Amino acid sequence: MPILQNVLLQASKDSVFLTTTNLDLGINCCVKAEVEKEGTVTLPVRELSKIVRELADIEVDVETSDGTKVSISTRGSTFNLVGMDSKEYPPLPGLEESDSFTINRECLLEMLKSVSYAQSVNEERYMLKGVFFKKESTDLSLVATDGRRLAVATKELTISENDGNCEFILPSITVNELEKLPQIGNTILLSYTDRQVQIELNVSEQTYENQGFRGSIKLISKVVEGKYPNFKQVIPKDNFKSAMVERELMLECVSRASLIADERITLRIKNKEMEITGQSILGDACENMPIDYEGEEATVSFNPKFIQDPLRCVKKDNITLEFRDDMSPGVFKINPKEKEQANLLCVVMPIRTD
């Protein structure tokens, strides 16, 4: 449907409502405006976004004619766009008899950031192309995996509209749009059915005055059909070696060692020190860093990207690395003391050495 390349603008009273959809995901928001004449129009969203992005942060005049032609003007600039008849624009679906729960906006976005990198990009494994939400009473877990690594973020909800359990898979495209939400409002309301999820970011009065948003920003998305695999079976329960490492330093060392590495780097863990090496037919690199570890020496190899991704996505200075041997998965863990932060873990499959 060509009209799905457009955004629907509806001017009414002192507001303009903006809606866009691809039939699987819909987004709706409202901004304040001085409306001289009510009406609706659809415009190509890509071109409109480019124009708005380049305009100065000042008032913009928008005029329509014939229901499809629009003139956008501001100080010294005028743009004319041709849209399509708004009557052809499909309405966003509503959720009926849905359950819901509330979560802090910043916490949810941090949890998503902590796991979304592990989503699968394999079209054949469609159930893994998204983030799995699992709510048990007041505990919420977000999970992503591509079969070679697993990321889990868990948080105890402090505000809950419903104490029931639920689980659904949010598609990767919805996750990407959710991560782009503006940093406004304090809470997000998630309403869900067996087939759809509505994510509503409430806008405060202060935000209305400062940025022009009003009401709420809503995302309505279909969920991925199918049952998510039992991720708890993947988490090792018998790792008996544990080292405390400085996150930023380890990220720097892994990044430098990977410059020479092929598809793997090797961690040699010994008393108070970790040696990180990478090699290829072109040469080799070696990094040494202090760690908090006392025990038998161990060596394990990983894909460097699978280490870099979780290290980049957390704020905590120190993390725990759990391991057993060169044939077993490694586990990166963060258990923050602050209640506002989520517990995080990332399971990474090793690369076998010859």
Annotate each predicted stretch with a short phrase.
Residues 1-354:
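Structural preference for solvent-exposed beta-strand-turn elements
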